[in-house]
């Protein structure tokens, strides 16, 4: 429905915001499910395809919408809370979906004990090619690697 409305209104971009990290690839099993980037099937610890996967249908539908939309799409999520901005989504042939950007926010990461609660400023420039730009905002009292100012 989001993409149908964006197309009907001739929107220049779409931003989706979710708590969950659905896992995009095979890169980081400590933070998200491992996932075959072509089939989008979740992998078990032994490397086999999982039979239960709550995100595969969602990701397959999202991939189809991103390809058809052809304009910038940002997926913002927390959950694993490792701050990064990247382009992890591939099409079924293994080509990077260049109009898709994943933004993973700061947060309290229970896996590594980091209470990295900061915030992210998003700028929207409808006439720019990428539309969205991002600027991390560090809260001085929440610094974990560099001591907070006295």
List where the protein language model places each region.
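Binuclear metal-dependent phosphoesterase catalytic core
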Residues: 81-150
